Design a protein with these regions (language model features):
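Long, terminal "pre-/pro-" and other extracytoplasmic accessory regions
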Residues: 1-396
Length: 396
C-alpha cells in the first residue's frame, strides 16, 4: 500500500499539473475525472496503512478535498462556466502542495515521517464549489509514465507495414549485419519467426563483448541490434557531446536506410545515450515511426538500435491539409502555457488511427508541457508533462 500510495500521489500531481495548461473540452474533463478517481484510490490505500506510519487524518482530509474540488470544477465545466482567476490560484496551490507531499512521501513514508504541515493550511481547501462526493476505489484509468518521449511505446501493432516485399537470404542479411555493426565476424544465431521474421547473428570482439543483431527476412532492414558501451557514468553529457552523438546516430540511420529522421527525446545511462528518432514527411513528425539508437558516450560509436516501431508503422501516407491555421490552434492552448515552439505532428490515437496535430511545447511556471491541438477540428487531443532528470527527459 505504501508504494501504491506514493504512485497515486505522484500521478495526481502530474494530472494537476496538466490541468493548469488544459483548455476546455475533452482533455480537461478527462483530467478532472483522473484526479477524482486518484483521490478515491489514495483514500482507500490510506485505510490500509497503520496509523503509526502516517498521520492519515490530515492527509486524508487533503486528498478528499482535492477530489471534491475536481468534481466541483467538472460541474462548472458542464454548466459552461469559465474557470476564474480564483480557480487558477486554487489549482496552483493544490499542485504545489501535492508536489511537496509526493516528494516527502517518497523520501520519508517508509520511516513514518510525513509532512502534514504542508496540508494544514485551510487556504488550500476553501472553495465555494465543494460538494459531497461519493468516493470510489474502482480505478480504471491512470496517467501513464511514457519513457523516451511521447508515443515512444505505442499500442501493439497488428501487422508490420514497413518491411518491404522482397525476401532476402541469410548471406545477404549477414552482409547487412556486418555493415551496420562494423564487424566481419558475424556468426549464425538461428532465425526468428513471427510478425517480423528475421535472420539472427552474434559477434564477439577482442574485449569479449558480444553483439546480437536481427535482420528482417522481408525487405532486409535491421530489426534490432545491441552491443555494449565502453563504460562511463550514468549522467547526461554536455551539449557538444550530445550533438556529436546525435549526428553519429543520424549518419548510422542513413546507412541503415532510415532517411529524414528527427531526434525527439534522449536518455543517458550505463555509458550510452538512447536517442529516439521519428520519421518526418513534409516537415511533419511521424511519431509512430520511431527508431531508438544507442550511442557510446565515450567512443561515439552506435552500439545498438531498435527499429520495431518503425517497421510496424511506416507506410506511405497521404497527409491531410490542416483546416485549422497555426494562429487558431494557438488560441486553443491555455493562456497559462508560455509557448516556446510549435510543430506539426502525426500522433497515434488508436492502434489503427492517427491525427494531424499542432504540437506546442512551453512552460507553466517551472514546469514544461507539450499540448497537442487537432489540426482538423481544433480540439485538444493530448497533454504531456516533461520530466527533466539527470539522465535526460521523460514525459508523463
Amino acid at each position: 500500500a505504501f508504494t501504491e500510495l506514493c504512485d497515486d500521489m505522484s500521478n495526481m500531481q502530474t494530472a494537476l499539473g496538466k490541468l493548469r495548461v488544459a483548455g476546455s473540452g475533452g482533455q480537461y474533463m478527462l483530467l478532472l475525472d483522473d484526479i477524482w478517481r486518484l483521490s478515491g484510490s489514495c483514500v482507500s490505500l490510506m485505510s490500509q496503512i497503520p496509523s503509526s506510519h502516517i498521520d492519515t487524518a490530515e492527509l486524508n482530509s487533503f486528498v478528499v478535498r482535492i477530489g471534491d474540488y475536481a468534481r466541483a470544477l467538472s460541474k462548472k465545466a458542464l454548466n459552461d462556466e469559465e474557470r476564474t482567476a480564483e480557480d487558477e490560484e486554487q489549482l496552483t496551490a493544490l499542485y504545489d502542495s501535492c508536489a511537496r507531499i509526493s516528494r516527502e512521501l517518497n523520501d520519508r513514508l517508509s520511516i513514518g515521517d510525513v509532512p502534514t504541515a504542508a496540508v494544514t493550511n485551510e487556504g488550500y481547501y476553501e472553495s465555494a464549489y465543494a460538494q459531497d462526493v461519493k468516493q470510489s476505489d474502482d480505478i480504471d484509468k491512470f496517467p501513464t509514465l511514457i519513457y523516451d518521449g511521447p508515443f515512444s511505446e505505442s499500442s501493439e501493432k497488428r501487422e508490420a507495414k514497413g518491411l518491404g516485399t522482397d525476401e532476402i537470404d541469410r548471406e545477404t542479411a549477414r552482409a547487412t549485419a556486418e555493415k551496420l555493426t562494423g564487424t566481419d565476424r558475424m556468426e549464425d544465431a538461428g532465425e526468428t519467426e513471427g510478425t517480423i521474421a528475421s535472420w539472427d547473428f552474434t559477434a564477439t570482439d577482442e574485449q569479449g563483448r558480444e553483439t546480437g543483431i536481427s535482420i528482417a527476412k522481408r525487405g532486409g532492414k535491421i530489426v534490432w541490434f545491441m552491443g555494449s558501451a565502453a563504460g562511463g557514468e550514468n549522467q547526461m553529457p554536455d551539449e557538444a557531446t550530445r550533438e556529436r552523438m546525435k549526428q553519429a546516430a543520424l549518419e548510422w540511420l542513413g546507412k541503415a536506410g532510415f532517411d529524414d529522421m528527427h531526434a525527439t527525446y534522449a536518455q543517458y545511462y550505463s555509458g550510452a545515450g538512447v536517442i529516439n528518432f521519428a520519421a518526418t514527411k513534409d516537415d511533419i513528425i511521424l511519431y509512430n515511426d520511431l527508431v531508438k539508437v544507442w550511442v557510446d558516450i565515450e567512443t561515439n560509436e552506435v552500439i545498438g538500435a531498435d527499429a520495431r516501431n518503425y517497421l510496424f508503422s511506416h507506410t506511405e501516407r497521404e497527409m491531410p491539409t490542416p483546416s485549422v491555421n497555426p494562429g487558431e490552434a494557438e488560441a486553443k492552448v491555455s493562456v497559462n502555457l508560455e509557448i516556446e515552439s510549435r510543430e506539426l505532428a502525426l500522433i497515434p490515437i488508436t492502434v489503427e488511427t492517427e491525427r494531424l496535430c499542432y504540437e506546442f511545447k512551453g512552460r507553466c511556471g517551472e514546469d514544461e508541457y507539450i499540448v497537442y491541438i487537432d489540426a482538423q477540428t481544433g480540439a485538444e487531443q493530448q497533454i504531456f508533462v516533461i520530466i527533466n532528470t539527470e539522465n535526460g527527459q521523460l514525459t508523463a
